[in-house]
Amino acid sequence: MAVVVIAEKPSVAEDIAKVLGVSKKNDTHWESDDLIITWAVGHLLELKTPEEYDDRLKDWRKSVELLPFIPEKFELKPNSGRGTNRKQLTAIKKLISSKSCTEIVNACDAAREGELIFRRIVEFSKAKVPMSRMWLQSMTPDSIMRAYDGRLDSSSYSKLRDAAVSRAEADWIIGMNGSRIASTFLRTGRNDGTSMSLGRVQTATLALIVDKELEILGHKAEPFWELEVDFKSGNSEWSARWERRNNVEDKDNPLTKAHRITEETEKQELEKLLNSDGKFLTKQQHRDSKENPPLNYDLTSLQREANSMWSWTSKRTLSVAQQLYDTHKLTTYPRTDSRYLPEDMIETIGKTIAQLGAQNHLKSHSQRLTDNGLQNVSRNFNDSKVSDHYAIIPTGKIPQGNLTGDAEKLYDLICRQFLSSFHPPAIWDVQTRVTTKDNHDFKKEVRILKEAGWREVKPKSNSIPEKWNSLDNNPAATEATSHKFKEELTKPTNRLKEAKLLSLMENAGRSIDDEAMAEAMKGKGLGTPATRADTIEKLISRNFIQRARSGSLRATAGGIKLIELLRAIPVEWITSPELTGDMEEKLSSVQNGEFSRQQYMKIIFDKAEEMVTRIKNHDRSELFKDINSIGNCPKCNEQLTETVLSYICPKNEGRGSGCDFVFWKNTSGRWFDRSTAARLLDVKELTDLHGFFNRSGEPYVASVKINDSGTVEFLGGGESTSSSDDDELCECPACERGTIRVNSTMYACDNQECKFRGLSQEMCKRKISVDEAKEIFVEGKSKLLDDFTSKKGRPFSAYLKLDGNRVKFEFPPRKAAAGAKEFPVVAGVVAICPKTKEEIVETPTFYQPSNDGSDCKIQIAREMSSRAISRDEAKQLIEKGEIGPFDDFVSKKTGKNFTSILYLKKNQAVGYKFAKK
């Protein structure tokens, strides 16, 4: 008789086996006389797709009347992944269905997904024996043994199961029905590269990024000045900024900030003040500012800090944190939403702190806590704020020198946060100098560390100028040694980086900096800490958003279009972070037993019905009819109407009939929001307009105008062109009037009227050097360049070639497959390429151009489908474009002969054309 333990992955199973003394290893499990340790490989089972319940649902378009489709009972099937997954599932099913199995122990991750993985396996296997649960908080031997000895009956986790199953079914219902109805009814004529899909958390997260993007695109740059003055008093020197007294700031108007000067009269008054006689007087004030130590990390706060410090993606941080937990056993369970510790862990924490002292770089901090005792105990230890898991902290185990660079950095960050949390606050001396003359103030503030406290562990520099020094008197006579009016333009807010997006997701779209307020929002966010990284990556893979090299995220045209469509229909709940957060809170209530699974699923059924009905029944021509027009047609003066894709004249009847004015919202790499489009119609020209993106996803500015004939015209500028301040490279090959110059991200023409798109300094993750760029512009083509990386992460080589107004990739002849048959080579020309007049010759494996860098694309394999292609046949194929039919080709799949004609396609590749039967 045996107990079967199911872990979530092989490495965890091995750790459990070692601790429990199970030493015999088989292909699919570890075993002893009375204990078997096996493993899943993540999700071995998944929910069946709609067409597996009903054949009619195979055709998405023809089956829309069957939507929303909700199975009476959800059914499982083996995951459509690798064959090894099926083998492992079969093995587990056999083990837990065996008559010798007396108990099944769930040792999968102690969270919703781990519960779901285990419950699905048991349900699919139809096992009927008692079940229990190991709740693993860390992977140290002591923790594993405690979890095994203290395992509880699975019924104790029935609410966790309800929440896990409800989450999976809710995502299936919204995702499957939403994606089908969206693909059928929301597609537009323009291909924007997006994969049309809707999701309960995914779409609300996209809405956050779209709203930020529209805010940025709609920003109108306004001019202002800032006044900086250099002061001197005794041996003290500093710079200070003018600030308006009794200023009333409007948060929606950045020009109302106290230090911004918008009126020429105010600027002139300040100029007069600075040039007049009379001394300035400086008063200095001191105040102490307490900076409390941080809480320990939960997953989201760890991801945010790693993104802020090192620009790591959420996915990267989670991956490294998972390694530290299950591979190295150095930190506790990472997928937690708590930043607190259980009250019964105080003694354990003391031991952990002492153990960390064995590492030289942490020794002094550990010793300080040992000598002085722990601070903030009542704050850090709080049972009411610990849910399934406590905060991410070190286990006390010492690294063995086998950590990667990423793992070492993240481990050190977690250790320092942990030690900091038990230190006293840091006290800063905040010194403020206000220099005054004739009721005008010039302010400067510095912060000097007075009592280090927790900043001993996580240091931060003083913000003190080199010659700050002490004032001789207070107040002190002061002279202005120089001044500068800096002319600036207001800038749009920054695009979201993952640190900020994670915070918004955690708080359902609300920007919350206060820790207590953030804690009150727990459970009301979008998704969970464990799923947020995947949500972001899904949006990127589906081309709804893009991640720039800087790490900032922007909504693509496809993403903006989808959210605008859903709101116009309207299906407001799926684009609302607040409403989605409320649904997430109800899911947490299911897990806590405060809300039933049936109640939650009823909400999901109703939402799915509403979504499908509204999308199916919407009339696209009516979506924007109640929205005010952005302006009049520049050609005929009619009020423009808005569509999903454009601002168009109502007299535009298409096919050249009526007024032909149309202004596409997605134009030249920019989405033209309503306010920007309206401004263009009003003033006729917008110069240095931000919000354009090149094909590499990098931003640039450009100018756009409506010309005398009423046509929208792009003038170039910014990153697609250069200015005379940029370094000169060579003459522009496109317009022959401008000069190619090197700006911050591009090699581009300085002629504002040139249509050349420029060459990005980085293409497919490879830097293009100045010499390589010059060769392209002067010679028309580069040498063969290595080290490009495809979207799938694969390396490749290519030429870069001028093609009209752009630079494109040109790929070298492909190499023969490994093991390809080689033939003797006969010297001489086989044929002449009819397109390029290039000589075609023999190689051991191909008939191809004699010059590797040729424009000719002919490359005929000397053996195709196990049939040798003779020299004469190759000549005929090149000159006539077709040979055959031949009946001695052999299929790779079946091994049987087949008959086919060979022909040259338009791109000069060889294709098969099957003879009519």
Residue ranges and their predicted role:
Residues 90, 99, 143-229, 287:
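C-terminal or mid-to-C-terminal helical accessory/interaction module adjacent to the motor/catalytic core
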Residues 109, 309-313:
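A conserved hydrophobic secondary-structure block that centers on an alpha-helix together
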